[in-house]
Amino acid sequence: MKNVNNSKVKGLLRNVSVVKRTAHKRLVWIGMSVCATPLAWAQPKTVDQDGVSLTYDSGIFSKVEIIELKKQPLPDPHDRLNVHPANLLFVFYANAKYVGSIKLYPLEDRSEENLRAAYPELLPNTFALARLITDRPALPLRYPSGNPKEIPTIQNQMAEQYFLSHARYIDFSWGSGVGFLVQYSQDASEYAVGSRLDYQIEGISWDKSIAISANFEVAHPDLPPTKKDGTIRDKNGDSIGEAAYMKYLAKMEKFLDEKNEASFNPPLDSIQRLVGSLQFKNVDSSGWGSKFDGKTTVIE
């Protein structure tokens, strides 16, 4: 079973490499957006661990934690709701406040005989993301109702993507992915757009060995003020109802889509640049499962 499932996913992942050869022809507008951004950080700092390096602006991020997360495979994970292979996690802080993270998942694990049995969602999620990146349909995909379909993520978010905006494909030196503004919810609350807004990037390396998942908190100055997890209410302070809330989300999607990436805080292109600074040199990600034990390195 392991060989069949791995070969199926890798067969599709091979198609992702075609994107590398044709991206400059199909995504010229992405290149133009990147070129409009300064090419250097004000206070660049490069960190390197386990063969993975990235460069960030130490004037923006006051602290970075690098965590070698232990694997949590079935049938006996520490948390049955959070099953995952060993992975390398970069956590970013600004003035002691968490602002985002970049997580690297190995797509093979030599320490597990059956990858699908150990991590049931890893290969299907990778397959769905690889197919999206390869086929590149216009984003966001939509249901007949007009509501956006969820964008595949490597790790189960255990929540619903109920709001999407600024979704587009992005090519990096290390691979290809998709970036999008998103809000997640585990309940039916009518959360205001901006109350839990994140910018997320999901990608796969060109050599098909690592999947990358980045998530950063963002805001926009033109959004109506709202507190964390704030909700939309009518003039009497009551729920506006599902139909009205869906119309509100569609309106806000269009509203944010019209905003330039550089106008967000932090700018979306700065997050893309941070993720794009990743470099892999002699990375043995398939060996992380037998090596990582939770060690944390702090850079300040």
Regions found by a protein language model. Give the residues of each.
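N-terminal secretory signal peptides that target proteins for export/translocation
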Residues: 1-24
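Sec-dependent signal peptide recognition
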Residues: 25-32
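Boundary at the C-terminal end of the N-terminal hydrophobic targeting segment
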Residues: 40-44
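N-terminal module-boundary/linker segments of secreted carbohydrate-active enzymes
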Residues: 55-60
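A short acidic-to-branched-hydrophobic micro-motif
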Residues: 64-151, 213-218, 222-225
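Signature of long, low-cysteine stretches enriched in small and polar/charged residues
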Residues: 80-82, 128-209, 215-224
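Surface-exposed amphipathic alpha-helical segments
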Residues: 218-300
